[in-house]
Amino acid sequence: MNWLNALPHQIPFRAASSVIDRSEKSIRGKFLWTANETMPAQIMMVEAMAQFAGGLVFEAQGFISGIDNCEITRAIEPGDVVIVHVSVDADFGRIFRFSGTASIDGVEVARGRFYLASSDAQT
C-alpha cells in the first residue's frame, strides 16, 4: 500500500506530496506550496517533515509528540517546491526521534528535531 495515500491528512493540511527516495533510516520527498494554502508556511514545513517521517517508520498512524530546536530561516513563497529530508535519530519503542531539513533550490530554509509517537502498539 502507498503510505502517502494512507495519511489521514487532507488538503490543506497534507504537506507530503511525493517521495524522491527512501531508505530504511531516511526519506526525501517534496511538497509544492500554493497561493491557496490556509496554513502558515512555517507550520507546513515542520508538518511536512513529520508526515514524511511518519511514513518512514509507521504502518499505523502516529502523531507529533515533540519539537526541538526548530529553526526556519526563510519564508516559503507561492509556487516554491520544498525538498524535505528526514532521518531517524533514535528508536525508543513507540516513540522515534528524527532530524529534518527543508530546502528550496538547494538552499536550506528550515531544520529541526522532532518526535513522533505511534498511536498503535504495532510500528
Q: Residues of each region from the PLM?
A:
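Compact, glycine-rich, soluble single-domain proteins
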Residues: 34-56
